[in-house]
Regions:
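Sec-dependent signal peptide recognition
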Residues: 2-10
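Short beta->alpha linker loops
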Residues: 43, 72-73, 110-114, 136, ...
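Conserved phosphate-coupling serine/threonine residues in phosphotransfer and NTP-handling enzymes
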Residues: 36, 134-136
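Short, conserved structural micro-motifs that define repeat-unit consensus positions
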Residues: 123, 128-130, 177
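N-terminal helical cap/lid subdomain that shapes the substrate entry/recognition surface
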Residues: 23-120, 124
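Conserved SAM-binding loop
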Residues: 37, 111, 130, 193-194
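Hydrophobic h-region of N-terminal signal peptides that target proteins for export
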Residues: 11-18
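Asp-based, Mg2+/Mn2+-dependent phosphohydrolase catalytic module
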Residues: 18, 22-26, 120, 137-251
Length: 251
C-alpha cells in the first residue's frame, strides 16, 4: 500500500469519526448533587428530624413533606420547616443545630451506587461535557466533595452552586440547569439531566432537555412519572439505579 493511499484512508477514517461524534444528539450531562451524585439526602433528613423532635410542635416529618423541600433551595426548605413545625429558632440557629449533626457526617458521604462508572463513561467514552448543578452553596458543596476531588476534577467541566447570581429562581424553576448548559456551551435540548427529587426533575423538564433521568425512592416514583412535560420533546426515564442507564439514549 502506497503512502498516498494510507493518507487517504486515514483522512476517511477521521472524517467518519468526526461525523459520528457531531451527529450524537446529546452533547452534555448535568447532575444534581445531593441524592444524585452523593448519598447525602438521607443525612439532611436525619438532621431535620433531630431538630424537629427537639423544637417542633409534634407534627410528623413525613414523606409528603420531604417531597416539598427536596431539591429546593436550602433557604426555602429551612424556612418551610421552621414555619410548619412552629420552631422558635432563627434561621441561623436552626441551621446551626442541623450542622452540629452534619459536620461529621457530610465529609464522609459516599457516591451513589454506580454513578462514578456512569460519569466516567459519559465523559471519556461518549465525549460528553459534564456539569454539577446544586442548590447548595459552594462552602457546603466543597465540604461534601472533600474526599471526591479527584473524581470531580477528572470527570466534570463545570459546577454551579446555589448562590450564583444568574439563578433568579430555585428548583422547580429551570434556571440552574439553564446556567449550567450555558457554561458548558450547549443548548438545553443537547443535554441529559440527572435528578433524584421531584422539584429537581420538574426543573429539568422545564428546560426542554431531550432526556431527563429521575432516580426517585419508591414513595415518589409515581409522582415523578406524572410530572407535566412535553412528551414529544423530552424523554423522561425513571430508573431504580444508575446501573440501569441505557447508553443508546445518547445517540
Amino acid at each position: 500500500m502506497t503512502s498516498f493511499l494510507k493518507v487517504i484512508i486515514l483522512i476517511f477514517m477521521l472524517n467518519c469519526a468526526f461525523t459520528q461524534e457531531s451527529n450524537q444528539k446529546i452533547k452534555a450531562a448535568i447532575f444534581d448533587l445531593d441524592g444524585t451524585l452523593l448519598d447525602t439526602q438521607r443525612l439532611y433528613d436525619e438532621a431535620n428530624q433531630i431538630v424537629i423532635n427537639q423544637y417542633g410542635n409534634g407534627k410528623k416529618y413525613d414523606a409528603d413533606l420531604q417531597v416539598k423541600i427536596h431539591g429546593a433551595p436550602p433557604s426555602f426548605g429551612n424556612k418551610y420547616l421552621i414555619d410548619y413545625f412552629e420552631i422558635k429558632l432563627t434561621m441561623d440557629e436552626f441551621m446551626g443545630k442541623k450542622d452540629e449533626y452534619l459536620k461529621e457526617k457530610i465529609p464522609q458521604c459516599k457516591p451513589m451506587e454506580g454513578v462514578k462508572e456512569l460519569t466516567h463513561l459519559l465523559k471519556h467514552k461518549y465525549g460528553l461535557k459534564l456539569a454539577i448543578a446544586t442548590s447548595a452553596f459552594k462552602n457546603s458543596t466543597d465540604i461534601k466533595l472533600t474526599n471526591h476531588k479527584d473524581w470531580i476534577k477528572e470527570d466534570f467541566d463545570v459546577m454551579i452552586t446555589g448562590e450564583d447570581k444568574r439563578i433568579m429562581k430555585g428548583k422547580p424553576s429551570p434556571d440552574i440547569f439553564l446556567v449550567a448548559a450555558n457554561d458548558l456551551g450547549v443548548k438545553p435540548e443537547e443535554c441529559i439531566i440527572f435528578e433524584d427529587a421531584v422539584n429537581g426533575v420538574q426543573a429539568a423538564l422545564n428546560t426542554g432537555a431531550t432526556i431527563v433521568v429521575g432516580l426517585p425512592d419508591n414513595y415518589v416514583k409515581n409522582i415523578m412519572k406524572d410530572l407535566p412535560h412535553d412528551e414529544i420533546r423530552t424523554t423522561l426515564c425513571i430508573l431504580d439505579s444508575f446501573k440501569d442507564f441505557d447508553y443508546s439514549l445518547l445517540k
